[in-house]
Design a protein with these regions (language model features):
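Dual-mode signal for accessory low-complexity, basic/Gly-rich regions
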Residues: 240-355
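Active-site bordering "gate/hinge" segments
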Residues: 1-275, 281-284
Length: 355
């Protein structure tokens, strides 16, 4: 099979009221995977001329000859044709580059002019388009294209000898959906909120994770859903499918078909069509995620979670997690004294997903 990834991006940064960075980039890379006599070989090329592509094929075959036999890894036998809706996921708009530059300058200058803000050390505006195509020798043709417009800013605030820095970002499908004023106000508010923060006494607290920190915590332990980790013997959840592992009020889905999210995926890296999958259902582990190889190993079906880049080998990966709403009201959730967690450090050094 062949993966072709391509992309274009515009990146802008401002400093002290002037444009500091104006960067336009484009890329294209081919990633080939061959299976010969049960052995897998991969190779890639950033050039598209016939000589470069012929060399890529030859290199993949050579690499396969030195690889061990992979009993369960196969090329998809599907001949489906899949394509995302460009009008939905890669819409165009009439915003000019000059207007995007004005947005970038305004974002930095407005935040720099807020009360107690010493400077805006980090900020940026990006307009990114990405495309992926997956082809197989069995006739599969899968194509996706998406656009993401981004803006972010960090403020350094200072009062006397005390300072603090916080940042925030926005993402949208079209540039007019970005709102510099809203971003500036929220970044300023968040930074002022921690300016005079002090350690709290050590004891047990009720805590609420904000949207950012909650996602970070779940990401640290995402490998618990990996069928590849289970196949490799390093997933403690391998034999717990169907068992209770969490509070019965917790249901976690991987929902790649949710178009409001930027993890939308019509198909995975093998070209397998994706679908919504329950990972934790009312506290019980409902499923692991599989590509075709891990699915074959466990005698089950692929869940449409194959991951592979043009330069990498076959793995598994989540698309976009969704936690279903609980039954408690917002007022009851926030009753009493609690801590809201807005920033986490040391997650990977302080957490062991294997144990």
């Amino acid at each position: 099979d062949l993966i072709v990834d391509a992309g274009e991006s515009l990146s802008l940064k401002a400093r002290d009221g002037e444009l500091e960075e104006y960067k336009v980039t484009s890329s294209q890379i081919f990633g080939l995977r061959v299976i010969k006599d049960g052995r897998v070989g991969t190779a890639y090329s950033e050039a598209s001329d016939s000589d470069a592509l012929d060399s890529m094929v030859e290199q993949a075959l050579i690499n396969a000859s030195f690889a061990r036999v992979e009993e369960f890894e196969k090329i998809s036998n599907s001949d489906d044709t899949l394509a995302t809706d460009n009008a939905l996921l890669c819409p165009s708009d009439a915003v000019s580059i000059d207007e995007k530059i004005e947005f970038s300058l305004a974002l930095e200058s407005k935040l720099a002019g807020m009360d107690k803000v010493k400077n805006v050390p980090y900020n940026g505006v990006q307009d990114v388009t990405g495309q992926r195509q997956v082809f197989t020798s069995n006739g599969l043709n899968a194509q996706s294209k998406s656009r993401t417009c981004l803006s972010f800013a960090y403020a350094l605030v200072e009062e006397g000898d005390v300072n603090a820095m916080e940042g925030l970002g926005q993402a949208a499908r079209i540039f007019p959906s970005l709102d510099a004023d809203t971003l500036v106000k929220q970044v300023h508010l968040n930074t002022l909120s921690i300016l005079h923060g002090k350690p709290v006494p050590s004891k047990h607290y009720d805590v609420i994770f904000n949207a950012e920190t909650q996602a970070e915590v779940f990401h640290v332990f995402a490998s618990m859903f990996s069928g590849k980790s289970a196949k490799d013997g390093v997933n403690p959840m391998r034999d717990k499918v169907g068992e209770a592992i969490a509070d019965p009020r917790l249901t976690i889905l991987d929902n790649p078909s949710l178009t409001d999210g930027f993890g939308y995926a019509l198909f995975d890296a093998e070209g397998t069509a994706t679908d919504k999958l329950a990972l934790v259902d009312q506290g019980s582990l409902a499923s692991l995620i599989h590509n075709s190889a891990t699915a074959a190993y466990f005698d089950t079906q692929s869940t449409g979670h194959a991951s592979r880049g043009p330069k990498s080998t076959l793995g598994v990966g989540l698309h976009q997690l969704e936690i279903q709403a609980g039954t408690d009201s917002d007022s009851s959730l926030k009753a009493g004294t609690y801590l809201e967690l807005v920033n986490l450090t040391g997650l990977h050094s302080g957490a062991n997903p294997l144990s």
